[in-house]
């Protein structure tokens, strides 16, 4: 017996669009929406991070603590500074997942940039690239420091969550920045060597850790020169 049930209406514009769509087009999902309530469940670096331009290169310092909702210490040995280029390093500030994703994405883009152009990326171009990704990507409130060395000299940049890029001789980001800035500005001198800058940075991180619940448990130092990036972790007592 013939089925007389009417089939779907194929005459409307919506139906036409469905049948005319490219069968080979990728199916693009939506970016996940994150709320303030969700952020309470996210591992965050809390953090105090410092970048100092020196006569030798750049020194970057961070504490080691990660927290949940700013109240519970979830990890006491987080490396919050990573090599992003053979002569540049970037700190992790904000949600751990967002910062790690940001670094992976930026590394890939730097490799692509250099492969296409056949030359090393400049720190100015790298900072611009980082700012563009911070503004346009789903990296959830990151605020890193970029420090690097190129043919034009030694450079330190702070990158805000909206993609703003600011260059300075030294900078601080993270939850302990107000305390760290006080110590850093008191001890900073122009044309410091990397060794001198390490001591100043360590003292500034320790001062922040005394008052900021999101910072503490030791320090990672990145020594950035034209020869490369060297990153090591220390207890405060080893440096001060």
UniProtKB/Swiss-Prot annotation:
The active site is at residue 47. Component of the proteasome core, a large protease complex with broad specificity involved in protein degradation. Belongs to the peptidase T1B family. Its EC number is 3.4.25.1. The gene is psmB1. It catalyses: Cleavage of peptide bonds with very broad specificity. SUPFAM superfamilies: N-terminal nucleophile aminohydrolases (Ntn hydrolases) (SSF56235). This is Proteasome subunit beta 1. HAMAP family: Proteasome_B_A. The keyword RNA-binding does not apply. It comes from Haloarcula marismortui (strain ATCC 43049 / DSM 3752 / JCM 8966 / VKM B-1809) (Halobacterium marismortui).
């Amino acid at each position: 017996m013939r089925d007389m049930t009417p089939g779907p209406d194929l005459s409307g514009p919506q139906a036409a669009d469905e049948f005319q769509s490219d069968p080979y087009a990728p199916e693009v999902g939506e970016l996940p929406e994150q709320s303030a309530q969700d952020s309470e469940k996210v591992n965050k670096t809390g953090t105090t991070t410092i970048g100092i331009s020196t006569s030798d290169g750049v020194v970057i310092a961070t504490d080691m603590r990660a927290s949940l909702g700013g109240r519970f210490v979830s990890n006491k040995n987080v490396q919050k500074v990573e090599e992003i280029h053979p002569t540049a390093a970037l700190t992790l500030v904000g949600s751990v997942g967002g910062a790690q994703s940001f670094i992976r994405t930026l590394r890939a883009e730097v490799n692509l940039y250099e492969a296409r152009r056949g030359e090393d990326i400049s720190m100015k171009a790298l900072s611009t690239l980082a700012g563009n990704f911070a503004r346009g990507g789903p990296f959830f409130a990151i605020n890193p420091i970029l420090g690097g060395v190129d043919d034009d000299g030694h450079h330190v940049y702070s990158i805000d969550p909206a993609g703003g890029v600011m260059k300075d001789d030294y900078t601080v980001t993270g939850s302990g920045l107000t305390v760290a800035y006080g110590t850093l500005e008191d001890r900073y001198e122009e044309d410091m060597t990397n060794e001198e800058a390490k001591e100043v940075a360590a003292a500034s991180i320790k001062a922040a850790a005394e008052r900021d619940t999101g910072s503490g448990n030791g320090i990672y130092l990145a020594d950035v020169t034209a020869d490369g990036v060297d990153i090591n972790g220390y207890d405060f007592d080893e440096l001060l």
